[in-house]
Amino acid sequence: MAQDATTYEMPTRRDFVKGGGTIVGGALLAGCADGGADLTRTATESAASATSDETYTVRMEPTGTVTFDRVPETIAGCDPTYIDMLVALGHGDTVESIRTRRQYLTTHYDELDGVSIDLSSLTQLASKKSGVSKEVFYEMDADLHLMDPHWLTRILDSWSDADVEEISKGVAPFLGNVIFRRTDPWHDYRYYTLYEAFEKVAAVVQERERFEAIRSIHEETVEAIEAGLPAADQRPDALLLYAPDEPEEFYPYRLSGKGANKEHFRTLGITDAFADTDVSGFSTSDSGSIDYETLLEIDPDSLLLRYRGKARTREAFEESIVSHVREHEVGSQLSAVKNDQIFRGGPIFCGPLHNLFMLERYAGLYYPDRFADGQIFDRDRLANVITER
């Protein structure tokens, strides 16, 4: 996609009334420049700051500052990472939309009593035929668009900056940052870690205590895992790849790169087997593939394979992907195949609740002798944090 040097300035202040309340939005959408223009804004030290007794502000790159006089009652989402945050904070019922339902894996909620989201009720934003329609945003009439506008202008390549301005003025402001990966050349503004972004969302819905409680569970889980890890030189490396059914080629991700969907692997000390190669990660400008010969040349300790569509059982994963790799003339020579170290790669969009389950799952898969007990965090404790008012 051609890059441009456009810096789009949102309205500095706008007012609109919904259901007796007002949300005042002001933001800057950073363009994707080749010319070196300054496209970032300094973030505030706190996730939210009060501007008066009745309003509060939340600031996030690249969208800038949004001022609220009440907690949003309806929120248009796109990235499941952020929707998982809202569910974690007890505000899943505010979510109006999602990019595509099939990309939002929700089976982990089944283990948390009282935690759920009705996927069928969410408006699906992306359409193969028509892209993303502005009319859908007018129809939803949400209080806030919790998404980086670059989802619409770059990743989905459906909107212009003028379209973003129109919806921001006519419906509601945007707030968000693409955090699921950091391989796109246009992402030259600040990147947020999973919990940095989560803290911003907690500020939006005014759930500081609930956020801190979940962060405590996360920190305790990480501490328990780190205490049980083997020495660094005894930890395996891995290739994280997208694999179609019966794969003949693979699309690489970089474990060493930033991205919320890889944070759990880094916590577990899984290193990137692409580290000493010139292979780059998947992005809007690079969707190159690699073949079995390249895999064998690298010969990683393990393979983490992602796939399209809904979550699959281990049996379905074996049947559609792994069996083909094992039977392939070159694939069968891989150390990961010989040692039975081929695992599902986990969701592309991984929020804070996903992250806890992924930490636990991969700790058991990679280090079964050290994490034989299975559960590392308390499901009931987590569910109570989410559901109690």
Residue ranges and their predicted role:
Residues A2-M85, E209-D245, R306-G309, V322, ...:
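Bacterial Sec-exported substrate-binding components of ABC uptake systems
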Residues T74-S160, E165-E166, A273-D276, S283, ...:
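A short, structured surface patch at a secondary-structure boundary
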Residues A76-G77, E96-S97, L144-D148, F174-G176, ...:
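Structural recognition of the beta-strand scaffold that forms the well-ordered cores
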Residues I83-V87, E135-E139, E165, K169, ...:
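Solvent-exposed, polar/charged alpha-helical surfaces in well-ordered, non-transmembrane soluble domains
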Residues H91, M140, K169-V171, L268-G269, ...:
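Short, structured coil segments at secondary-structure junctions
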Residues R102-H108, W151-S160, L175-A197, Q234-E263:
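Extracytoplasmic ligand-binding site segments that recognize negatively charged/polar headgroups
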Residues P185-Y192, E196, L305-R389:
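Structured C-terminal subdomain patch of bacterial secreted/periplasmic proteins
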Residues Y251-D286:
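Alpha-helical, coiled-coil/dimerization segments enriched in small aliphatic residues
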